[in-house]
Amino acid sequence: MYYKFSGFTQRLTGAASSTAYSPQGLRANVPSESPAMIFGTPTKLVSESSATVEYMGKNRVPDLQRIFQASDNIPVHLKRGVPDRLLYRSTMALTVGGVLYCLVALYLAAQPKKK
């Protein structure tokens, strides 16, 4: 009896001698020609379309460039006002809280157990 590893069941299964001696994945009768292309039709490029795309919305890049490139001595992470300040402060509060929590957890883990 000959055995071969089954990739489907992940176990050894019975096999014929010819399949047991041939390595898996390497077959002698592999076709030499490549398969047909799945996407053989040419795709239409965006530049070829005549109508404007409606789902993109307004281009906000020039407005954001104007805001972020202004030299008003405000840090870049606070340039957009109140939402940026709120996000910055909440991020810093969570970071400080997480560091304190880790330090307390390390302190409690370092204490010997009471018997």
UniProtKB/Swiss-Prot annotation:
Gene inactivation phenotype reads: Fish are smaller in size and display abnormal fat deposition and decreased female fertility due to impaired oxidative phosphorylation (OXPHOS) activity. In mitochondrion, disrupted interaction between mitochondrial respiratory complexes III (CIII) and IV (CIV) leads to decreased mitochondrial respiratory supercomplexes (respirasomes) formation. Phenotypes are rescued by doubling the food supply, which correlates with improved bioenergetics.
Which GO terms fall under biological process for this protein? mitochondrial electron transport, cytochrome c to oxygen; mitochondrial respirasome assembly; regulation of oxidative phosphorylation
- Transit peptide feature, positions: 1-75
Indicate where this protein resides in the cell.
Mitochondrion inner membrane
Report the SUPFAM superfamilies cross-referenced here. Answer: Mitochondrial cytochrome c oxidase subunit VIIa
**Gene Ontology CC:** mitochondrial inner membrane; mitochondrion; respiratory chain complex; respiratory chain complex IV
Family annotation (Pfam families): COX7a
Under Gene Ontology molecular function, one entry of this record is: protein-macromolecule adaptor activity
Gene3D superfamilies named among the record's database cross-references: Cytochrome c oxidase, subunit VIIa
Q: How does it sit in the membrane?
A: Single-pass membrane protein
Transmembrane intervals: 86-108
Q: Which UniProt keywords apply?
A: Membrane, Mitochondrion, Mitochondrion inner membrane, Transit peptide, Transmembrane, Transmembrane helix
Q: How does it assemble?
A: Interacts with the mitochondrial respiratory complexes III (CIII) and IV (CIV), promoting their association.
Reported function: Assembly factor that mediates the formation of some mitochondrial respiratory supercomplexes (respirasomes), thereby promoting oxidative phosphorylation and energy metabolism. Acts as a molecular adapter that associates with both mitochondrial respiratory complexes III (CIII) and IV (CIV), promoting their association. Mediates the formation of various mitochondrial respiratory supercomplexes, such as MCIII(2)IV(2), composed of two CIII and two CIV, and the CS-respirasome (MCI(1)III(2)IV(2)), composed of one CI, two CIII and two CIV.
Give the family from UniProt: Belongs to the cytochrome c oxidase VIIa family.
Q: What is this protein called?
A: Cytochrome c oxidase subunit 7A2-like, mitochondrial
Organism of origin = Danio rerio (Zebrafish)
Its gene? cox7a2l
